[in-house]
Amino acid sequence: MTKKYNIAVIGATGNVGRETLNILAERNFPINKIYAVASNNSIGKKVSFGEQVLQISSLDDLDFEEIDIAFFSAGSEVSKKFIPIAIVKNCMVIDKSSFFRLSEDIPLIVPEANLSTLKDFAIKNIISNPNCIAIPLAVVLKPLDNEISIKRVVISTYQSVSGAGKAGMDELYDQTKSKYIFEEKSPNIFPKQIAFNLFPHIGDLNKDGYTSEESKIALELQKIIGDHLKVSVTSVRVPVFVGHSISVNIEFSSKVDAKEVEEILEDADGVVMISQTKDLAYISPTEVVGEDAVYVSRIRDDESKENAINLWITCDNLRKGAALNSVQIAEELIKTYL
């Protein structure tokens, strides 16, 4: 008989929390009891879980001793406060915030890239889910680095407003609507107007000129792939509701061309390659909404530099960029360790 688990999704009313519930139901995760958990402000709300409707329960009242696996999707402050309580009660935690990602003794996992480090979860009973851009990048870069060592990557991201939560999506919607009725909506969630606009500012601005988002992506990729990887990132917020896109220039340590890179990625787990021979041989963010794969297109040689190629990555940031990755981690946990 298959063992079943008591599961809690913390932050269940948010974009990623809701998607986590959807994916757990879609993939028939072996669940005995499911808890949809949020702050006291969400008490009385309901969320979907497959064909069920779940009542939101309060995080303050949650007894972690009854929970086998907790998915934290409520931000760093909640993780900082409640995860230490959870692990004392022997609850296994998969954290989607940035709080623990760079801790040396906590694994930062992308199953297609570094599953061998999952065993380290036992040190603290915590596994970190990477940044929504670091995940698809790791899915693509790790198999390439395994075959032909990567020297350097230059990354420009085009990140949808859902990365800033439901409030970010609402702000884009409201500003877009207001433009058609000649009203002005001041920015609240974002630093500048997001409707019909874009800006290279996600997270806080650091003293070195990079944003906190750009620093996270670089440091997380190095933790997942290796310190030998040199990374430069520019992160851009774009007026798209769901779906992140990434332009990547990859410089390899030895001779390689676009055809060889395409052949490697065609065999890579979690990747869908769009051949350059097709008409409209690229994928846009609206085409990947609801999809689990990381899509790669527009692979081409960099004619300005030897041993370098350019490519375009697109994925659903709420699924593989967040919720799906965490559920895949849980599936591997129960398959191998629990």
UniProtKB/Swiss-Prot annotation:
Substrates-to-products reaction catalysed: L-aspartate 4-semialdehyde + phosphate + NADP(+) = 4-phospho-L-aspartate + NADPH + H(+)
Keyword Oxidoreductase: yes
The protein, known as: Aspartate-semialdehyde dehydrogenase
Transmembrane segments: none
Swiss-Prot/TrEMBL GO biological process terms: 'de novo' L-methionine biosynthetic process; diaminopimelate biosynthetic process; isoleucine biosynthetic process; lysine biosynthetic process via diaminopimelate; threonine biosynthetic process
Function: Catalyzes the NADPH-dependent formation of L-aspartate-semialdehyde (L-ASA) by the reductive dephosphorylation of L-aspartyl-4-phosphate.
Subunit structure: Homodimer.
Pfam annotation, one family: Semialdhyde_dhC
EC annotation from Swiss-Prot or TrEMBL: 1.2.1.11
Active site: 132 (acyl-thioester intermediate), 244 (proton acceptor)
Pathway the protein contributes to: Amino-acid biosynthesis; L-lysine biosynthesis via DAP pathway; (S)-tetrahydrodipicolinate from L-aspartate: step 2/4; Amino-acid biosynthesis; L-methionine biosynthesis via de novo pathway; L-homoserine from L-aspartate: step 2/3; Amino-acid biosynthesis; L-threonine biosynthesis; L-threonine from L-aspartate: step 2/5
Keywords: Amino-acid biosynthesis, Diaminopimelate biosynthesis, Lysine biosynthesis, Methionine biosynthesis, NADP, Oxidoreductase, Threonine biosynthesis
